[in-house]
Amino acid sequence: MEINVKIKPNMRIQAFYLFFIIVSMQIGVGILGVPRLVFSEAKQDSWISILVAAAYVIIVLLAMLLILKQYDNADIHGIHRDIFGKWLGKIFSTVYILYFAIAFYSVLLTYIEVVKVFVFPDVSNFVMGLLLISLTIYGVLGGLRVIIGVSFVFGVLANWILFLLIHPALQIDFNHYLPLFQAPFVDLLKGARATSYTFMGFEILFLVYPFIQNKNKVRISSLLAVTWSSLLVLSATMLAIGFFSAEQLERREWAVLVLFKTQSFPFVERFDYIVVAELMMVVVPSLLFLMWGLTYSMKRVYKVKQKLTLYVAAIIFLIGTFFFEKHFETQRVINFAEQFGFWFIYVYPFVLLPLVLLKKRLKKRKGAGSS
Amino acid sequence: MRKRMKRSSKNVFPLKIDELEQLMKSEFDKSPDLSFSKYEHQNKKIAVFFIPYQVQPDRVENLLLTPLLESKEEWSNTAILNKIPLNSGKEYQQMDEILPGLIAGKVMIYIEDEAAVVSYDFLNKEKRSLEGAETESVVIGPKIAFTESLVTNLNVIRWNIRTPDLAIEEITIGKRAPREVRLIYLKSLANDTDVDTMRQRLNELDVDNVEDSNVLMQYIEDDSASIFPQFHTTELPDRTSYAILKGKIAVLMENSPSALIAPSTFFSFFESTEDLYMRWNSGSPLRFIRFMSMFISVVLTPMYVAAVTFHYEIIPTQLLISIGQSRAGVPFPPVFEALFLELMIELLREAGARLPTKVGQTIGIVGGVVVGTAAVQAGITSNILIIFITISALASFTAPSYQMGTSIRLLRFPMIVLAGILGLIGIMFGLCMLIIHLLKMTSLGRPYLSPIYPIRFEDLNKALYRLPQNFQYKRFISLSLKDSIRFSKRNAKEKKDIDE
């Protein structure tokens, strides 16, 4: 396995799309439930928590970019190979692959759960799983260009649902935000920790970085993406806190979805149904990228054909949907994904960064000594 | 067969006139159409042979036979070619050149003991005259349509694009029954890779015959499994030359009244030349209406089915009451009701397309008005659904390309079934599948959904809407043409201050 990836010229993508890649990975079903999670820790000071979390995400992102900059055109698997050697590197990469699998599974189950709660209480997991997984297979078979296209087109198309939030936004009670600065520092951090599942997804940068043509635009594009998703999460949380009273909010698992119920037109009511359907457009790009990450990583690390991984993983996930029918089971998967992702996405780059810098310095010294 | 081919590729000349007659008779043994006449002139035997209905008899008489027989001098091949200076004079030596030549309306002259046959082209091809477009009718702008004659069509195109820059390449397609195909593009504009791809696809086509350019399209398109057409076929010369001038490639085929335009994008199928002739601020909304109606046509009936079957909560109470009253007597689930009505509309359309125009109109009235009213009164369908079905059928007919309109109309059926099974989730699944499919498609190797993905902001003003002409100083960037500037931006109007 080479450390640096050679990309065919027709597979290169513009950094412009990185914005949509990262936003579509970050904004998924997580945003629907995040207000309650943050609120139960930080109460009306949730906005501080989210700002703290966003700042932390940006720091992690900058660290990731710094790591990637040390190489010509490497992805995370190449870096693992370079830093940890053949076998240890493979183990770390395998953990990454496992992360993609678990994240895929948690997104899949969460969307099925939302559909069950809001639209079809009796729909079987298998049918919904079949729909989503067949979309995933069909999309991933198109390759990275198509997946990025999906994230871009769906990312633009799904934005109309934001306009439906204008109506609830006009009915906010500003007293819900007061008094300011009440939460102790620990609670604020706990609140920030609660957003970790929602903000996950920017780690895809570690994989798509070699594909990007204009590397000088990567930083601005990814920073804008993270800022935009942070803004969305922040406004969703603020809306939910302003609209619902404290005990209402704590009892509503998907508070943001409930907000859509208030909007109505002479010909359509109950927009939550439509929004849940529209959410498929938000969820599918995440699923596609996670599945692509899984198959591409398998190809990079173990030289398995992507098609083989795709079909096998799809069948396993489809069978897997049978075993997590209940709410608490789904919740367990999400919690596990969150735990796993937290250490892997938010902490691990800071372990990798000094190692990469050290290795580079050693190499430089060696090069200087030999010449 | 193989034996005969071998023999005819051999040079049989020189030979006696009687031997030639025997040979020709044996070649044409199953079709007694060959006219083989022998003359004696200045002690030399001359044979003239041709297929009478493939040539223009009076021209043959006046231009060829009269000078041939009335002359006093002795004829030889060179003498004939010199004395009868029609530009199509040629010498042939091989049988497999002579036989297709006879079929293509050539008159052959053989002088005994010469080494070759002299031929002149007198092709008489029956054709209809240029008429107005039938399937792609336009309100303003040129109205003539292509005919079945390639020469006429080329004439029209040449007259539209009067520049030597226009390349018209000749390619022959089909093994058993060959047809001429022309590849037309602007040398200084069209992308070389695209032209090469197209030429290669046409040259490598290994089929025994191709019926029409619509069939040709199916042979050479990128993804034959897709429901969407990947090349545009049009019967408007106007539209074809517009596409050529934009840097695209056109393919014309003998005996086919439609041209093929490549590469095409999804959005170009909703583009009518009328948009250009209208002013930009009335052309853009018209195009927008077409996009809207495409969406409506795919989604409206499925939405109704989904709402009435599963999610009646999304219908406001006032509306729900009227829908409920209208549906009260209907014994079928909404899916069947919708499928039944959609099928009826398709029947009407199909019957209307097959029948003569006058009868077709009657059928439309009988089918639409009488059966529709009767179906509602009999309690089989609801009024409101009929309204939705009619709107979506109308919407599907707004697509300027008939092929695209048909694809969209057919897409409704799986969407209705999906809506009937899984409601809004099913519709969304269908839409997602559709968009992913469109993203995967290519036309001549170029993305089908361009310029949306990959996004080219400069192209949006031509593909999705139109701006005034002085904003359109660039050609489509996504086509990567040799010259993408239409005119200098400086020539566009300068800004002025208020006039005092």
Model regions and ranges:
Chain B
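Membrane-interfacial loop-to-transmembrane-helix junctions in polytopic alpha-helical membrane proteins
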Residues: 278, 282-285, 326, 352, ...
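Short aromatic-rich membrane-water interface segments that cap or initiate transmembrane helices
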Residues: 283, 321-333
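Membrane-embedded alpha-helical signal segments
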Residues: 1-299, 314-317, 438-500
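Generic detector of multi-pass transmembrane helix bundles and their immediately adjacent loops
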Residues: 303-306, 316-319, 331-500
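Functional cleft and adjacent loop/helix regions within the main domain
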Residues: 311
